[in-house]
Amino acid sequence: MPPLIPGELIPEPGTLELNSNRPTLTLRVANSGDRPIQVGSHFHFFETNTALHFDRDAARGHRLDIPAGTAIRFEPGDERDVRLVALAGHCKVFGFNGLVNGPLD
């Protein structure tokens, strides 16, 4: 058996599919600001920086569909499609920019 390395992750062989069978949607997002904006994997996308222009109502209750601990950076003037995944669990959102602070429904 090889030596153990603290913090090492040893995944099962094969391919892992993130957020399988979870509802997703794709939105066009544009950074109208003069500074880069970075959004993390678990940030409630509805509550992102107001310099990001997209259909906020559609994004309510969603986060980026990217691996945990990663982020997407939007440079000034950048415009791209992003895939969002619905939040899971009790669907209560607290913090972020304080726009919900309770249940999503």
Curated annotation (Swiss-Prot):
Subcellular location(s) per record: Cytoplasm
Listed pathway(s): Nitrogen metabolism; urea degradation; CO(2) and NH(3) from urea (urease route): step 1/1
BP GO annotations: urea catabolic process
UniProt xrefs under InterPro entries: Urease_beta-like, Urease_betasu_sf, Urease_subunit
Enzyme class: hydrolase
Highest rank taxon of the organism: Bacteria
CDD domains in alphabetical order: Urease_beta
Keywords annotated in UniProt: Cytoplasm, Hydrolase
Pfam families (UniProt xref): Urease_beta
A GO term, aspect molecular function: urease activity
Catalytic activity from the UniProt record: urea + 2 H2O + H(+) = hydrogencarbonate + 2 NH4(+)
EC number, UniProt record: 3.5.1.5
UniProt keyword Signal present: no
Keyword Cytoplasm: yes
A GO cellular component entry from the record: urease complex
NCBIfam families: PRK13203.1, urease_beta
Quaternary context: Heterotrimer of UreA (gamma), UreB (beta) and UreC (alpha) subunits. Three heterotrimers associate to form the active enzyme.
Family under the similarity heading: Belongs to the urease beta subunit family.
Protein name as catalogued: Urease subunit beta
Organism: Prochlorococcus marinus (strain MIT 9303)
UniProt gene name: ureB
